[in-house]
Amino acid sequence: MGKYMRKAKVVVSGEVVAAAVMELAAAPLGVRTRARSLALQKRQGGEYLELRSRRLEKLPPPPPPPPRRRATAAAATADATAAESAEAEVSFGGENVLELEAMERNTRETTPCSLIRDPDTISTPGSTTRRSHSSSHCKVQTPVRHNIIPASAELEAFFAAEEQRQRQAFIDKYNFDPVNDCPLPGRFEWVKLD
């Protein structure tokens, strides 16, 4: 901020002080704002964009790269139809940018047959409702999972050993039998509350 301000020289004679004040009034105060720079640009009449203190001239867009050549006849017909569609899109006008890479693509993305569980459930857009049972479909055998719930006797036998171990650890630590709800002789003295 200091470089935009000028100090007035204080001299005994009134003439020097007045000259300094007149000089300050003639110079623009403050920073150049966007409005001031636009007004200066209109007065100067230049064909450029002014960003901060640099001038940037707008260049025309680069020409599109030439299309690639293909060896097959099918690719040549695909190029011809792509060129016709490109001409049709260009004729509408506007600033639409054509994606040449997308037009030159001649393969489709597919899901591998090993990842499809049931190929009969997948329908392609525009296909009929008739199912085609061709040998080209990959049949993946999925294992059949049955939810077998063990009997309650098996569950009791499975958890009984761990429950017994936890019960014995509690009895040893607190000298209290939680199953029978009675204190046992040991290091703690149990008192029944009212």
From Swiss-Prot:
> Which example biological process does GO assign this protein?
regulation of cell cycle
- Composition-biased stretches, type Basic and acidic residues, lie in 49-58
List the GO molecular function terms: cyclin-dependent protein serine/threonine kinase inhibitor activity
> Which residues constitute the signal peptide according to the record?
none
Region annotation (Disordered) ranges: 49-70, 107-139
Pfam hit, one: CDI
- What drives induction of this protein's expression? Down-regulated by cytokinin.
Q: Which UniProt keywords apply?
A: Protein kinase inhibitor
Cellular component GO terms held in the UniProt record: nucleus
Give yes or no: UniProt keyword Hydrolase.
Answer: no
Family of this protein? Belongs to the CDI family. ICK/KRP subfamily.
Q: What is the designated name of this protein?
A: Cyclin-dependent kinase inhibitor 4
What organism, scientifically named, is this protein from? Oryza sativa subsp. japonica (Rice)
The gene behind this protein is KRP4
